[in-house]
From Swiss-Prot:
The gene is rpmD. This is Large ribosomal subunit protein uL30. One of its GO terms (cellular component) is large ribosomal subunit. It comes from Borrelia garinii subsp. bavariensis (strain ATCC BAA-2496 / DSM 23469 / PBi) (Borreliella bavariensis). Belongs to the universal ribosomal protein uL30 family. InterPro entries: Ribo_uL30_ferredoxin-like_sf, Ribosomal_uL30_bac-type, Ribosomal_uL30_ferredoxin-like. Pfam families: Ribosomal_L30 (PF00327).
Length: 73
C-alpha cells in the first residue's frame, strides 16, 4: 500500500489504476468515485493522467486499488 502513496505524490505522470476489492458493501460515495474512474468490477484497469482531481479520487479509494506507473500511452 505504501507504493500507492509514493506514486500519488508524483506529478504529471500516467498511472494505471487496478481495482482489487469489491464494491459490495462500500459507501455509496466511494462506489461513485470508482465508477467515475471507470472501474466497475474487480480486475478492471484504466490509465489516467495524474492531476489534482484524479489524486483526490485515488486518495479517497486508496485501500481498494493498486497503482502502477505507465511510461507510454
Amino acid at each position: 500500500m505504501e507504493k500507492n502513496r509514493e506514486i500519488i505524490s508524483k506529478n504529471n505522470i500516467n498511472v494505471q489504476v487496478f481495482l482489487v476489492r469489491s464494491l459490495i458493501g462500500k459507501l455509496n460515495k466511494k462506489v461513485k468515485v470508482l465508477k467515475a474512474l471507470g472501474l466497475n468490477k474487480i480486475g478492471d484497469k484504466k490509465v489516467h493522467f495524474l492531476n489534482e482531481s484524479i489524486k483526490g479520487m485515488l486518495n479517497e479509494t486508496i485501500n481498494m486499488i493498486l497503482l502502477s506507473e505507465v511510461n507510454n500511452v
